[in-house]
Regions:
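RNA pseudouridine synthases
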Residues: 2-98, 108, 118-121, 164, ...
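Short clusters of hydrophobic/aromatic residues that line enzyme substrate/ligand-binding pockets
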Residues: 86, 90, 99-103, 150, ...
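Proline-centered helix-kink/hinge sites
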Residues: 2, 131, 149, 185, ...
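Residue-level signal for inorganic ion chemistry
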Residues: 47, 73, 114, 139, ...
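Extended, charge-rich low-complexity interaction segments
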Residues: 103-115
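Conserved structural locus in ABC ATPase nucleotide-binding domains
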Residues: 34, 113, 125-127
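Pseudouridine synthase
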Residues: 13-21, 52, 63, 92, ...
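Histidine-centered divalent metal-coordination motifs
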Residues: 36, 137-140, 242
Length: 242
């Protein structure tokens, strides 16, 4: 899914993926179905179900945690420690004309694992993130709570989410659903990945960290889910709590 395309419509959203599903029938007996979502400004892997049965199985796999997702983000600053588990409850609150998610110890449980893959001095870092839970704007709020908001995320990071002197591309949200692993009945696990959008590649070049990134994650070959998840299992050693 490209950044800027909403998955579902709303009172002010008339262009969205849900309204395009008929075009994606591609000769099948029925259009595909949505089984999960990405934020409008998040790019990356989005799975659609071809049949009602597939939709039911996929929905169950997301609820039971049989599926796993890996996100990549560029954040301003560098998290310390370099890997950890963020355990901060979240709640939705009305904002200035739009709803906003805030950290709330009495809110819904929200857990995210992260790892620093590469960094450009102290100004920015590339993170691999796994949402253990799936709350609205979870990764965005959790990264901001670390003091390292996602680049371009003015909603949750304010001015700290931008790098002075950067170009237009660096002012967009730098959050990408890199890979997903889902059960494929009778065939084991299905692994899917999405190439990085141009804006994130361009930002890395501006930060002059592209060589380190390619060496760390094998970008040229488009890394598999295993390399996207490197280190995830050991992340829970450190926790952030409210």
């Amino acid at each position: 899914k490209p950044a800027g395309l909403a998955v579902q419509g709303g009172s002010k959203t008339t262009r969205h993926l849900d309204g395009m599903l008929d075009v994606l029938t591609l000769g099948a007996a029925e259009p595909p179905r949505l089984v999960h979502r990405l934020d409008k400004d998040t790019s990356g892997v989005l799975v659609l179900a071809r049949t009602a049965k597939a939709a039911r199985l996929l929905t169950e796999s997301f609820r039971s945690k049989d599926s796993r997702k890996a996100y990549w983000a560029i954040v301003t600053g560098v998290p310390r420690p370099a890997m950890g588990r963020i355990n901060l409850g979240l709640d939705k609150r009305p904002g200035q004309g739009r709803e906003k998610v805030v950290v709330d110890e009495d809110g819904k449980a929200a857990i995210s694992d992260y790892r620093v893959i590469e960094h450009a001095g102290r100004s920015a870092a590339w993170l691999s993130l796994e949402p253990v839970t799936g709350r609205t704007h979870q990764l965005r709020v959790h990264c901001a709570a670390l003091g390292t908001p996602i680049l371009g995320d003015g909603k949750y990071g304010g001015k700290a989410a931008f790098i002075e002197g950067s170009d237009k591309a660096a002012r967009r949200l730098h959050l990408h659903a890199r890979a997903i692993r889902i059960p494929n009945p009778g065939r084991g696990m299905l692994q899917l990945s999405a190439p990085l959008p141009d804006q994130m590649n361009k930002t890395w070049k501006l930060l002059r960290v592209e060589e380190g990134i390619a060496a760390a994650a094998g970008l040229e070959a488009i890394p598999t889910l295993e390399s996207a998840y490197t280190g995830i299992e050991s992340i829970s050693a450190v926790s952030y709590t409210h």
